[in-house]
């Protein structure tokens, strides 16, 4: 069972609880048994947390949010199979190198071809991965803000976890956390940011810490074209609890 299937199943659980239509093609990517196991807690989550009811599912095509709620509010839904862990933002969280650098070109005018020429590097995935590492570490506050917007730019955020056990079976005891009213932008203090790797020692993964709290992980895949960043949700909860987000 992969993470995408669990995430889509969580969306289906919400949609089916409140009779919101989901396209058959999208529905086929979920798992009915997982959706049913999550459905048990959905209504209580919405009621206890006073979340407006969903009226439209819009998660297809990498939309940054998953549901339109009553009063035109928005809801994003994420999940982990087991304990709270790493989750990628939409659109820019796990793109190919082509998509990533096209995004940088559109948003910031960063030209990957010009940068490769400046560094006298061939246009290969390995070279692009190196530029990704350099750009991420040199512009971490800016990129963190981008990742934050594509992850939390919503009125309500639900995160389901403890859905499956370590053998891939249903726990029948899914858990959920809810966040709302998060800042649209976060002022990241560069003095509080650290990495577990340097550009030169970074092979595949590089953990990002804020005030010594692990809040995310960069990953450069060796066997496929993917430049990934995922937030550590447990770490984000610690930042919120300690009032380190502003």
Model-predicted regions and their roles:
Residues 1-65, 69-73, 79-246:
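Short, positively charged
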């Amino acid at each position: 069972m992969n993470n995408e299937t669990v995430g889509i199943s969580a969306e289906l659980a919400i949609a089916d609880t409140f009779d919101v239509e989901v396209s058959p093609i999208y529905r086929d990517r979920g798992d009915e048994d997982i959706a049913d196991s999550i459905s048990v807690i959905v209504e209580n989550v919405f009621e206890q947390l006073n979340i407006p009811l969903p009226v439209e599912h819009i998660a297809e095509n990498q939309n940054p949010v998953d549901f339109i709620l009553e009063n035109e509010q928005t809801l994003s839904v994420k999940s982990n199979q087991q304990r709270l862990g790493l989750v990628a933002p939409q659109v820019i969280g796990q793109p190919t190198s082509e998509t990533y650098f096209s995004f940088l070109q559109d948003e910031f005018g960063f030209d990957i071809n010009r940068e490769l020429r400046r560094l006298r590097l061939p246009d290969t995935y390995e070279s692009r991965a190196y530029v990704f590492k350099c750009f991420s570490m040199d512009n971490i506050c800016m990129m963190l803000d981008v990742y934050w917007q594509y992850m939390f730019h919503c009125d309500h955020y639900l995160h389901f976890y403890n859905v499956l056990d370590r053998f891939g079976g249903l726990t029948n005891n899914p858990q959920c956390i809810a966040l709302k009213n998060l800042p649209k932008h976060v002022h990241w203090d560069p003095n509080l940011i650290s990495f577990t790797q340097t550009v030169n020692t970074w092979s595949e993964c590089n953990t990002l810490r804020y005030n010594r709290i692990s809040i995310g992980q960069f990953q450069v895949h060796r066997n496929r074209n993917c430049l990934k960043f995922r937030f550590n949700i447990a770490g984000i909860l610690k930042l919120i609890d300690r009032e380190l987000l502003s």
